[in-house]
From Swiss-Prot:
Ranges for region Disordered: 1-43
Protein name per the record: Ragulator complex protein LAMTOR1
Assigned keywords, A-Z: Endosome, Isopeptide bond, Lipoprotein, Lysosome, Membrane, Myristate, Palmitate, Phosphoprotein, Ubl conjugation
Protein family membership: Belongs to the LAMTOR1 family.
Induction (free text): Down-regulated by cholesterol (at protein level).
Region feature Interaction with LAMTOR2 and LAMTOR3, mapped onto this chain: 121-161
Organism: Homo sapiens
Function description: Key component of the Ragulator complex, a multiprotein complex involved in amino acid sensing and activation of mTORC1, a signaling complex promoting cell growth in response to growth factors, energy levels, and amino acids. Activated by amino acids through a mechanism involving the lysosomal V-ATPase, the Ragulator plays a dual role for the small GTPases Rag (RagA/RRAGA, RagB/RRAGB, RagC/RRAGC and/or RagD/RRAGD): it (1) acts as a guanine nucleotide exchange factor (GEF), activating the small GTPases Rag and (2) mediates recruitment of Rag GTPases to the lysosome membrane.
Source organism phylogeny: Eukaryota, Metazoa, Chordata, Craniata, Vertebrata
Residues recorded with modification Phosphoserine: 27, 42, 56, 98, 141
Record note on modification: N-terminal myristoylation and palmitoylation mediates its recruitment to lysosome membranes, thereby promoting localization of the Ragulator complex to lysosomes. N-myristoylation by NMT1 is required for palmitoylation at Cys-3 and Cys-4. May be palmitoylated by ZDHHC3. Ubiquitinated at Lys-60, Lys-103 and Lys-104 by UBE3A, promoting its degradation by the proteasome. Ubiquitination at Lys-20 impairs the association with the lysosomal V-ATPase complex. Deubiquitination at Lys-20 by USP32 promotes the association with the lysosomal V-ATPase complex and subsequent activation of the mTORC1 complex.
GO molecular function, one term: GTPase binding
GO biological process per UniProt: cellular response to amino acid stimulus; cellular response to nutrient levels; cholesterol homeostasis; endosomal transport; endosome organization; lysosome localization; lysosome organization; positive regulation of MAPK cascade
């Protein structure tokens, strides 16, 4: 889309004008009347297209920034402080509601209160592991051989006229 270029002695009028357009906060964001994003493909040139896109990105970024250094907490009145606190609380509630799926996951089970003792103990003998594997294979084969045979119809038609 663009590149960063810096030169101390080369500064054309066009570069100054582009910098002024990008850094000018008084320019309104480019939105259509219905609130939809503007159609960048209908603009006559690619340069205007890039400028409009950069202006909209800059406007969105500027609207989402909270300047903490500009807020003087001593000069703020009580009702302004309460309004901001309410606004931040609603923003946090909206953001935290999208994270509810993380709260629904069950925590990992705690099988022991002293895992260091479990990890330091002797390993499970190989014969026990083989026996568990044989039992699991036997259970799998038994479950895979279960078949349901239909002996009669599941839906019986009654002779109701």
């Amino acid at each position: 889309m663009g590149c960063c270029y810096s030169s101390e002695n080369e500064d054309s009028d066009q570069d100054r004008e582009e910098r002024k357009l990008l850094l000018d906060p008084s320019s309104p964001p480019t939105k259509a009347l219905n609130g939809a994003e503007p159609n960048y493909h209908s603009l006559p040139s690619a340069r205007t297209d890039e400028q409009a896109l950069l202006s909209s990105i800059l406007a969105k970024t500027a609207s989402n920034i909270i300047d903490v250094s500009a807020a003087d907490s001593q000069g703020m009145e009580q009702h302004e402080y309460m309004d901001r606190a309410r606004q931040y609380s609603t923003r946090l509630a909206v953001l935290s509601s999208s994270l509810t799926h993380w709260k629904k996951l069950p925590p990992l089970p705690s099988l022991t209160s002293q895992p260091h003792q479990v990890l330091a103990s002797e390993p499970i003998p190989f014969s026990d592991l083989q026996q568990v594997s044989r039992i699991a294979a036997y259970a799998y084969s038994a479950l895979s051989q279960i078949r349901v045979d239909a002996k009669e119809e599941l839906v019986v038609q009654f002779g109701i006229p």
